[in-house]
Amino acid sequence: MSGGKGGKAGSAAKASQSRSAKAGLTFPVGRVHRLLRRGNYAQRIGSGAPVYLTAVLEYLAAEILELAGNAARDNKKTRIIPRHLQLAIRNDDELNKLLGNVTIAQGGVLPNIHQNLLPKKSAKATKASQEL
């Protein structure tokens, strides 16, 4: 029997592909969709909303991990620790604004010494530098 809805006529059945794979994402679109449905954010959730939100989350995670990896490499470490995440976020203007109220456990603080606390240049040092 050719055509029709039933049976395997013509071509073999295609293997199912996840929405994450269709969108070219690593993060799970199905899980984000489930969390949106169960979170009581709205009565109805469109089909594109979880894909878009998943893409945004994946981008933010990749951006933070890239900067944290750079911070770890600057400190001659091969493993990212919370301190590296803290340094990455606080040294980036946009991420610092986005995550300004977030406390990272074991993150520490940015190294900063107020100008008034630094030692003043002595008169001898300034004279010697002017003579050269």
Curated annotation (Swiss-Prot):
Signal peptide residue numbers: none
Modified residues (N6-acetyllysine): K5, K8
Cellular component per GO, a single term: nucleosome
Pfam families: Histone, Histone_H2A_C
Residues bearing the modification N6-malonyllysine: K120
Motif [ST]-Q motif, residue range(s) on this chain: 129-130
Keywords for this protein: Acetylation, Chromosome, DNA damage, DNA repair, DNA-binding, Isopeptide bond, Methylation, Nucleosome core, Nucleus, Phosphoprotein, Ubl conjugation
Gene Ontology MF terms in the entry: DNA binding; protein heterodimerization activity; structural constituent of chromatin
Protein name: Histone H2A.1
Organism of provenance: Saccharomyces cerevisiae (strain ATCC 204508 / S288c) (Baker's yeast)
